[in-house]
Amino acid sequence: MGIDDFNELKLKMDDFQSKIHQFLIKNNQDLATKSETYWNSESEKIKKIEALKDKLRQLEEHQISLEEEFESSQREVSEVNAQSKAFLTKRDKLIGEREFLHKELDKLDILLKEQTKDLEREKQSRLLQSSKDTNEVALFETLLGLHISANAQDAITFHFTSRTVDVSPQLSITLDVSQDTYKITDSNPKLPQIIKNDLLNNLAATDDLRSFLKAARSHLSALTEAT
């Protein structure tokens, strides 16, 4: 090999090494930028996983390319031992980065599995609470002889079941629950305002809905019998 050929080869190797150096710098910058944002949300974490997988594939492909070019360089020039060591260093660095990405992917997988378990526990808790609420409503209806409807927004109507075979009209009372304090918006038969005030004051003081409904039924029954 002539000196000119060796110099030309050395220039090519230096240029190749510079390209590798710039590629790794850009890789490190890209990874550092993406690492700052992938914790923002669950959807971002999933996107990050896919991006990391793509980057991992790129690194693996680039590693293969480097190894092929390195082997070719070894066959062409045995004099560039120093450059060969640099290639080995770059390859080891790429392998280290790939292992780091594998660890990051494992961490994200674990985090997503934990979040999935948390969501499942929350779902089960809500289902349990919903079942509990339904059972409490059914208990009220059984104990007090009534059924409950919510035909209007923020309003609950309690229809009292008759203890006799034929009672007309049906006894009922409607509570507005949209405000901090309850309000009686309707009843059948119509309750005097003084009785409404007394019922609402007792409910506000005790927060005992069962006692409120018993008292309301008693007043409504008395008004029905009086007519």
Swiss-Prot record:
Q: Where in the cell is it found?
A: Nucleus; Chromosome, Centromere, Kinetochore
Q: Which domain of life is it from?
A: Eukaryota
Q: Which residues form a coiled coil?
A: 40-125
Q: Which GO terms describe its biological process?
A: cell division; chromosome segregation
Keyword presence, Cell division: yes
- The question of whether Coiled coil is a record keyword is answered with yes
InterPro entries, per the entry:
Spc25, Spc25_C
Q: List the keywords (alphabetical).
A: Cell cycle, Cell division, Centromere, Chromosome, Coiled coil, Kinetochore, Mitosis, Nucleus
Q: One GO cellular component term, please give it.
A: nucleus
Q: Which family does it belong to?
A: Belongs to the SPC25 family.
Q: Which PANTHER family match?
A: KINETOCHORE PROTEIN SPC25 (PTHR14281:SF0), KINETOCHORE PROTEIN SPC25-RELATED (PTHR14281)
Q: What does this protein do?
A: Acts as a component of the essential kinetochore-associated NDC80 complex, which is required for chromosome segregation and spindle checkpoint activity.
- Fill in the subunit field for this protein: Component of the NDC80 complex, which consists of NDC80, NUF2, SPC24 and SPC25.
The protein's name is Probable kinetochore protein SPC25
- Supply the source organism for this entry: Kluyveromyces lactis (strain ATCC 8585 / CBS 2359 / DSM 70799 / NBRC 1267 / NRRL Y-1140 / WM37) (Yeast)
